[in-house]
């Protein structure tokens, strides 16, 4: 019994030593940071925490995306966060007016890095049918940088989920930029 245990200990030591050698080779070759970045990107991309900022009728569709029929939890976004400090994706759903633009910017500034913004619906994207009024901001992109536009008036929950998947893909691949959905 003790001899069998001794042989297993020797086997475990050899496995540990070989794993350490692999890690050392990767560190010397500079490959380990890339592997770690990919793992972290995968984990972070599959666990985005949205901050729902529903201002108008698009908020109803945003709430529908959280229901059991569409199940936003499948994409790692379990629930909308009520604090910007706990969120990394802001979903602006609705018309942003001049007074509300200050609030949107303040919430965006309070989010931790990296942070992403989804403009949901025609009103958030370009002012919608109210674009020509005196107090409506002609698109939330004039207040905060927008990463993904979700078109529609109001957009379907599936479109919001597609926009969220675009954000996740940006996180996983390390690409960040302006993505417009048509």
Curated annotation (Swiss-Prot):
Its membrane topology is listed as:
Peripheral membrane protein
Q: What class of enzyme is it?
A: translocase
Pfam families for this protein: Oxidored_q6 (PF01058)
**EC?**
7.1.1.-
One Gene Ontology cellular component annotation?
respiratory chain complex I
Required cofactor names: [4Fe-4S] cluster
Cystines in this chain? none
Its BP terms in the Gene Ontology are: aerobic respiration; electron transport coupled proton transport
Where is this gene product found?
Cell membrane
Q: Which UniProt keywords apply?
A: 4Fe-4S, Cell membrane, Iron, Iron-sulfur, Membrane, Metal-binding, NAD, Quinone, Translocase, Transport
Superkingdom, natural source: Bacteria
Among InterPro entries, the record links this protein to: NADH_UbQ_OxRdtase-like_20kDa, NADH_UQ_OxRdtase_20Kd_su
Q: Which Gene3D superfamilies match?
A: 3.40.50.12280
Q: Which family does it belong to?
A: Belongs to the complex I 20 kDa subunit family.
The record's note on quaternary structure and interaction partners says: NDH-1 is composed of 14 different subunits. Subunits NuoB, C, D, E, F, and G constitute the peripheral sector of the complex.
Q: What is this protein called?
A: NADH-quinone oxidoreductase subunit B 2
Q: Which organism is it from?
A: Symbiobacterium thermophilum (strain DSM 24528 / JCM 14929 / IAM 14863 / T)
């Amino acid at each position: 019994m003790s001899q069998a245990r001794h042989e297993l200990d020797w086997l475990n030591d050899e496995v540990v030593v070989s794993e350490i050698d692999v890690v050392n080779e990767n560190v010397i070759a500079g490959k380990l940071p890339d592997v770690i970045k990919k793992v972290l990107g995968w984990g972070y991309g599959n666990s985005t925490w949205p901050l729902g900022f529903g201002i108008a009728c698009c908020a109803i569709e945003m709430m529908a995306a959280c229901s059991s029929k569409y199940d936003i939890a499948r994409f790692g976004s379990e629930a909308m966060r009520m604090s910007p400090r706990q969120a990394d994706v802001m979903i602006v759903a609705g018309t942003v007016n001049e007074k509300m633009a200050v609030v949107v910017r303040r919430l965006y500034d309070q989010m931790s890095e990296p942070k992403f913004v989804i403009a949901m619906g025609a009103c958030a994207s370009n002012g919608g049918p109210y674009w020509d009024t005196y107090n409506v901001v002609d698109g939330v992109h004039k207040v905060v940088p927008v990463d993904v536009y979700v078109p529609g008036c109001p957009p379907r929950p599936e479109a919001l989920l597609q926009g969220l998947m675009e954000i996740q893909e940006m996180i996983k691949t390390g690409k960040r930029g302006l993505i417009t959905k048509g």
